[in-house]
Amino acid sequence: MAPPRNRAPKGRGARARAPIKRRNGFTTSRVDEIESEEPSGGEEGQFEDNLGDEMDYDGPMDDASSDSDEDVEDDKSARPYNELLQLLNTTADSKAPARKKRKTEHKDDKRAVAQNDIVVAANEEELLEDDDLQQQEPSDEEDEDNLDEVDADGQADSDNEDDNDPFEAHFARKEDELSKQIKAVGDNKWKTVKKELSEDLRLARAAPDTGSDLSCLPALKSIANLKLKRKLKTPALERLSQISGHAQQLAPYIFDYQDVLYGARKSSSSTQLRDILAVHAVNHVLKTRDRVLKNNARVAKEQDADLDLRDQGFTRPKVLFLLPTKQACVRVVESITQLFQPEQQENKKRFMDTFSATDDKSWESKPDDFQELFGGNDDDMFRLGLKFTRKTVKFFAQFYASDMILASPLGLRTIMDQADAKKRDHDFLSSIEVVIVDQADALLMQNWDHVDYIFKHLNLQPREAHGCDFSRVRTWYLDNNARYVRQMIMLASFITPEINSVFSTHMLNVSGKIKMTPVYAGAISETPLPVSVKQTFSRFDSLSPAKDPDARFKHFTTTVLSSLVRNVTSGRGNNSGGILIVIPSYLDFVRVRNYFATSAQTMNVSFGAISEYSDTRDIMRARTHFMNGRHSVLLYTERFHHFRRYQIRGVKRVIMYGVPENPLFWGEIVGFLGMDPAAIDEAAEGGVRALFSKWDALKLERIVGTKRVGNMLREKGGDTFTFV
């Protein structure tokens, strides 16, 4: 979990709901019972009874529901009169179809909603924890609206639905072809092709080895020729008139329903990528929905025919977005609504009030990636269901009535991994067909265990039927093969072993998968100082990743710390202090801090310590004492730097206990040496020293560059490398 920041108000009281009419469920031998799991526990256990997701719900989930409780009361009093008028009109013209009754929204109602939306629950535990999981069936009015939609524009869209449509080719492929591909994936038989797309970008593509040739797709510069729903064509062309940069290489694989891992995400290109993903997600929801509606109409028309229509999953949600903050969710939703252009957005004001916030003006000097991630509402505890009808997008829909789910890993896990086994539920993930993870590197800094937990529960057989019509469920769902058809898209600023594990373990798409990574020049060549800085890298031996922390600690205490202590205790000049030790892992930080506090070796060394869990008073004290020389050494975690991006003064020498994951941090931390212009030459001579092992290959490549990393890992003539 991220350190606490300024949060938007949490919690609301739940309104009463009308009774929900459900269809009888089906039973089948194909649905496996999943035994109740034990709660996994961990540092987020405190949220089991404290969801804080501000989710209260109105009555039945039809697209004519109103945000105002006053409308409901008014409707009750007016209902007998309205029903009488409707009866008279129907009698007068029995051939005319009954028109759908909609509620009008008045200014007074909006003011009432505004007052209700700012009410904060005194105790978040009073919220109904499983309210967003309650199942509701489409109302009769929605069904009528759907039939009208099929008659109105079904023919126009049908031209786009052919065998060349990636949607049809991917999800409706022949069973014998699918079986061969699934077997190849299960046997881990992949055919791979690699290509240098440009001087700064590499592509690796893999597909199940079934004997077919494999090549790379051509770049996509315009979406004009894509098989999009007619409703999306015009707004998509307006927002994405031209595709540029790396997105040209990514887009063909995204719209072809292949798994995508992109490791070169930048703030400058995030808007374009977000729009591309929004187009793809909405297009998928609309095509899935229209296919079901057209088949519904066909069943109603051909009631005596023996139709075998396989067009559904077990549950309604089809798209899952995993995002780091509420503000990131707002940006995605804005892209979605601007593309879908609904006539009505139910609960939109409440969504903006609880999810959006203004940027902190004091952060104008912060780096762009920091402002993008933490700007606005940076709360990492949320989940949201979006429901699409012909003219409406409904916010805060229950998950089983939603088409899309947007959530943070923490927000989603709190309802999946509750202490009460009866309340645990992950069936709403059973039919997810598109998973989109944006800013995956930010999720690493929160708690990657939540992400891994969610991935392990994707596309499992549901424990309950949830009103499913199993005669319409696709065969590969029933055969428990949905994970081989699911598309996963993950965007990150850089690749880590955890992210690579997702690529190899969870990206099992029968259509193939790609990994797109940059060619790094190296952060050491981009230091912000006006003078050259001595940058030294020391390699130590490590037998395995599990033994790496012990080997690193031993090398640090015997080789690095001994010389550091000598300089501090015997020095009479300016070199005796100002030593910043940057530690990537919090566990390593605790180990080093305890060693400084208890070891005889560091008995005469004064030090301060700052981590992501330090309170503000301790942080200010440690920074002040380090700047004025009272502390010779300052221990500093990479994760703290990620969340705060402070400028540390008084630094004369930097020791990297391990190279940082984020290459931007290298330049920022080296820049601390130049905070005092009068002593910049001395600080440049003190320079930077970093420890690394062969298990740090991915991190090291980003720091020293793609061309240098191989020699530094394999060099047998020495284990010290210096760059100036």
UniProtKB/Swiss-Prot annotation:
Biased composition (Acidic residues): 34-74, 123-166
Any single GO BP term: maturation of SSU-rRNA from tricistronic rRNA transcript (SSU-rRNA, 5.8S rRNA, LSU-rRNA)
Subcellular location: Nucleus, Nucleolus
One cellular-component annotation, GO: small-subunit processome
Region (Disordered): 1-167
Keyword Methyltransferase found: no
A Pfam family the protein falls into: UTP25_NTPase-like
Molecular function GO terms recorded: rRNA binding; U3 snoRNA binding
Stretches with biased composition (Basic residues): 7-24
Keywords, in A-Z order: Nucleus, Ribonucleoprotein, Ribosome biogenesis, rRNA processing
Free-text function comment from the UniProt entry: DEAD-box RNA helicase-like protein required for pre-18S rRNA processing, specifically at sites A0, A1, and A2.
Name by which UniProt lists this protein: U3 small nucleolar RNA-associated protein 25
